[in-house]
């Protein structure tokens, strides 16, 4: 197996415990990997603004030679905020998605950088519960600006009615956009061909790292692309079946039992 040069980590359900904590053991293994010259790249659906706390915890915030992939691969950037690659929605894309969610009677939020435009609806969005650090702006659909670029859209709604609605999404939308669940209550809408693997592919090209030397860890449907793409794809024990099916390794423990620390100790850290 090739020496691992980059570790791509999903946050929720993977790196973090259920109560959104980084354990001391996990932080220690990440620090040890970085001291060996391995890049540790948080790879998430969140915007960078919602990552500040975790980057500080890792000691990589504001660093010119540290990187984060946000919006499920739609934004590749240095931890200084400098953008290396960006793919976004136009207002026409948001309009098409909004028409579908209105028909399905589910809410829609449109996200631009650290601002969440909560499109007014009869159905209440639950997204503020997931990312309270973001700025939430209640907005009538007709007031959405065509001058703003939108990184992604989200539908945060109770699981049972959300899953029922997903079954009714028009097939043509799957041809036009990336549509996937990232949590039980969260459906994400991204530009076509934007997923974590494409973001990582662009980053390793910039860094000159071969994908055979990438280890990717995840648990949900939005992690599947990078788990399948990476030289070493690691699924958490708590991962959805589709992710486990494409992984090279399934950890014997869950995210609450420090599965990422186990994987780094086993596959990355070398004896001095």
Where are each of the predicted segments found?
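Short, structured coil segments at secondary-structure junctions
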Residues: 58, 64, 72, 173-175, ...
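Residue-level signal for inorganic ion chemistry
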Residues: 33, 72, 153, 227, ...
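Structural detector of well-ordered beta-strand residues that form the stable sheet scaffold
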Residues: 41, 69, 109, 180, ...
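Mg2+-dependent phosphoryl-transfer enzymes with acidic/Ser/Thr/Gly-rich catalytic loops
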Residues: 2-6, 23, 188-272
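Asp-based phosphoryl-transfer active-site loop
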Residues: 3-19
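Conserved acidic, metal-coordinating active-site core of Asp-based
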Residues: 100, 104-217
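Short active-site oxyanion
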Residues: 37-41, 65-66, 152, 212-213, ...
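Active-site phosphate-binding/coordination module
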Residues: 24-124
């Amino acid at each position: 197996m090739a020496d691992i040069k980059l570790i791509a980590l999903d946050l929720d359900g993977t790196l973090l415990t259920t109560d959104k904590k980084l354990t001391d053991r996990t932080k220690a293994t990440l620090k040890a990997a970085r001291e060996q010259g391995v890049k540790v790249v948080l790879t998430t659906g969140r915007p960078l603004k919602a990552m500040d706390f975790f980057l500080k915890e890792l000691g990589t915030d504001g660093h010119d030679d540290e990187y984060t992939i946000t919006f499920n691969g739609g934004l590749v950037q240095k931890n200084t905020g400098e953008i290396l690659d960006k793919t976004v929605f136009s207002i026409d894309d948001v309009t098409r998605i909004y028409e579908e969610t209105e028909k399905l009677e589910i809410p829609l939020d449109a996200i631009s950088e650290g601002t969440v435009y909560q499109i007014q609806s009869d159905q209440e969005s639950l997204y503020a519960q997931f990312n309270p650090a973001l700025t939430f702006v209640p907005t009538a659909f007709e007031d959405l600006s065509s001058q703003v670029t939108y990184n992604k859209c989200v539908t945060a709604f109770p699981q049972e009615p959300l899953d029922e609605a997903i079954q009714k999404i028009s097939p043509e939308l799957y041809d036009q956009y990336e549509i996937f669940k990232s949590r039980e209550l969260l459906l994400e809408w991204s530009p076509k061909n934007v997923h974590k693997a494409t973001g990582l592919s662009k980053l390793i090209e910039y860094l000159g790292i071969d994908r055979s030397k990438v280890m990717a860890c995840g648990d949900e449907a939005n992690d599947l692309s990078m788990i399948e793409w990476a030289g070493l794809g690691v699924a958490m024990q708590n991962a959805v079946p589709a992710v486990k099916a494409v992984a090279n390794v399934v950890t014997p423990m869950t995210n609450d039992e420090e599965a990422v620390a186990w994987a780094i100790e086993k596959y990355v850290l070398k004896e001095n």
